[in-house]
């Protein structure tokens, strides 16, 4: 919920409202039969979108609304995504929706069996295990020595951020969307200046991003159901949560039974 009167709200940046209250964080969530919301915050979901996919539009909208404009503005022909989790997968989908020719996903050995195959189904050109291969060497090989037009860090790891800066081409853009959970991390400021790199920090969604994401989900470029690992009725919420604790998953859906 946003106040509609503060400076960010007046600029259309309702996600940065100084009085913002989020459902599931500051207000009760929606793992229940009924939830009370202001009508002005509701979006109509087209019939073409299955309920299970409608459930993941909100987190996807943050990635889609922030990444696609950068890709179009920079006319990126290749994008490297560091991190094969939910944010990374959403970034992959967003990049492919913007007609990026080459999208490369970097992850770790734990991603090889499940997440990398999902990434390939979603259109990833290549997947790289950064624990067994040199990410900088591999990216330079795949880009003929030019480096990446856009790097999106979805890992929040210090090593991932540093590698992202290293593989970026001169004048390229680093999009930061991974939380480091640290007060600060060191970066080579002079190296950033010499590369004339652009660094964009993005967080949160707004009503416009949601609408744009809904329009995309109604006519996606591929089957997005591969993003859903498991579904369960609300009455079996505990078993689903237990499953998530013991298995590698992406998005999981509870439905009203």
Regions found by a protein language model. Name each.
Residues 1, 130-134, 155-156, 180, ...:
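Short beta->alpha linker loops
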Residues 1-82, 111:
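NAD(P)H dinucleotide-binding glycine-rich loop of Rossmann-like/cofactor-binding domains
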Residues 6, 45, 63, 95, ...:
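Residue-level signal for nonpolar/aromatic packing positions in well-ordered secondary structure
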Residues 34, 80-84, 106-108, 128, ...:
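Glycine- and other small-residue-rich loops at beta-strand/loop junctions that grip anionic moieties
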Residues 49-132:
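Mid-domain Rossmann-like dinucleotide-binding core that forms the NAD(H)/NADP(H) cofactor-binding site
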Residues 70-75, 113, 117, 121-198:
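Glycine-rich cofactor phosphate-binding loops and adjacent beta1-alpha1 units
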Residues 80, 104, 173-175, 200, ...:
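Structural detector of well-ordered beta-strand residues that form the stable sheet scaffold
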Residues 90, 133-134, 162-166, 170, ...:
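C-terminal hydrophobic helical "lid"/dimerization subdomain
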């Amino acid at each position: 919920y946003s106040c509609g009167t503060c400076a960010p709200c007046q600029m259309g940046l309702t996600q940065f409202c100084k009085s913002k209250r989020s459902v599931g964080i500051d207000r009760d969530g929606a793992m229940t039969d009924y939830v009370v919301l202001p009508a002005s915050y509701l979006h109509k979901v087209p019939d073409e979108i299955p309920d299970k996919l409608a459930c993941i539009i909100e987190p996807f909208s943050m990635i889609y609304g922030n990444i696609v404009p950068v890709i179009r503005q920079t006319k990126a022909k290749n994008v490297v995504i560091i991190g094969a989790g939910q944010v990374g997968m959403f970034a992959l989908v967003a990049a492919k929706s913007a007609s990026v020719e080459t999208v490369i996903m970097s992850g770790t050995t734990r991603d090889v069996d499940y997440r990398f195959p999902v990434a390939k189904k979603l259109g990833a050109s290549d997947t790289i295990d950064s624990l067994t291969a040199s990410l900088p060497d591999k990216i330079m090989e795949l880009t003929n020595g030019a480096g990446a037009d856009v790097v999106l860090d979805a890992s929040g790891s210090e090593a991932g951020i540093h590698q992202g800066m290293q593989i970026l081409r001169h004048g390229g853009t680093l999009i930061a969307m991974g939380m480091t959970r640290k007060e600060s991390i060191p970066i080579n400021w002079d190296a950033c200046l010499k590369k004339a790199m652009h660094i964009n920090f993005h967080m949160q969604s707004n009503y416009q991003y949601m609408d744009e994401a809904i329009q995309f989900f109604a006519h996606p470029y591929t089957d997005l159901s591969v993003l859903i690992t498991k579904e369960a009725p609300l009455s079996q919420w505990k078993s689903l949560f237990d499953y998530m604790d013991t298995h590698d998953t992406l998005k999981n859906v509870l439905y009203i039974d």
